[in-house]
């Protein structure tokens, strides 16, 4: 078969999957950072540090367990707008600038169909932290709370941390 025909032959099954409502799997990132609220109470963080990772975020994921979250860093600071498209569980969104929480969107509502509401303050932020709904209040996090995101060393040969409900990598 000619190369052009091969390309069309490979594209058709992919198009069929999209038209049939194929949904890509959720992303599971390793724990590479933490935010310690006290010396003995740290939130383990997946870091969505690329545009692709940020666009997927926590879509299609089950509820986050306590003391787990996803960090979305922005350098340079940006006007960040988040939505809950294809995110089945409510979240708390903490918007961070200059090492402190500048805004909180608590108990954001899942949105399984477009259009979806967007969340975010009318100011640039250095990053956004997503936690399970209710965790900000439960942990005593409020606007003005200091934020210190620190890297976590991953041990070579050890699989990345993931919740028990997460599927094992192929």
Briefly describe each language-model feature range.
Residues 9-20:
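Bacterial N-terminal signal peptides
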Residues 1-3:
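N-terminal secretory signal peptides that target proteins for export/translocation
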């Amino acid at each position: 078969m000619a190369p052009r025909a091969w390309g069309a032959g490979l594209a058709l099954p992919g198009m069929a999957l999209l038209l049939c409502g194929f949904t890509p799997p959720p992303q599971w990132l390793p724990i590479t950072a933490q935010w310690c609220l006290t010396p003995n109470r740290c939130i383990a963080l997946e870091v969505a540090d690329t545009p692709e990772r940020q666009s997927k975020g926590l879509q299609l994921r089950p509820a986050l367990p306590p003391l787990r979250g996803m960090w979305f860093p922005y350098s340079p600071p940006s006007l960040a707008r988040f939505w809950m498209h294809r995110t089945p569980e409510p979240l708390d969104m903490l918007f961070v600038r200059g090492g402190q929480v500048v805004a909180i969107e608590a108990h954001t509502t899942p949105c399984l169909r477009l259009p979806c509401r967007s969340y975010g303050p009318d100011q640039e932020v250095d990053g956004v932290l997503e936690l399970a709904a209710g965790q900000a209040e439960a942990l005593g996090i409020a606007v003005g709370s200091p934020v210190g995101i620190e890297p976590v060393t991953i041990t070579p040969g050890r699989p990345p941390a993931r919740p028990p409900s997460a599927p094992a990598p192929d």
